[in-house]
């Protein structure tokens, strides 16, 4: 979909890419409705790290791109519907730390584990989805929620920059001291962990 939006000097290729994008999206949505998030079985698979909140943001972002390309209301509806899960995973109330930190995302609605960022760089998908929604559906009733999400996340990132000063790098995120208790997410994040993974995690967090 993104390629179709950017290749404006080749109408034939643009049309082909749009058709493929719609077909791929339809296939992916059909499988998702059938299997949900499914279970991964491939060893060394780094996509284990992707959280449910990120998957839902990705669905929304993809649908928004197709809506921008085609103008079909069905894509707009999907984009607005699936981002609601992601919004429910964002921390909007301040933590009880000295900075009142908020704005980050949890991996799922249970809010047991926080999204941390690794070298694969998937963190941008949350804001890509929110921004595309704001650009394509300005009259939607949820528009203020999307804007608020962007503002909260921006404040969160800016608030953390002091911890990496003067290097100008974004930290991987805040951590919950007892995330190891969320065993499903903990062992999906850390492939082939040692027997004392809980102790090692606790030591690093301290």
Q: How should these model regions be labeled?
A:
Residues 1-206:
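Glycan-recognition and catalytic cores of secretory/periplasmic carbohydrate-active enzymes
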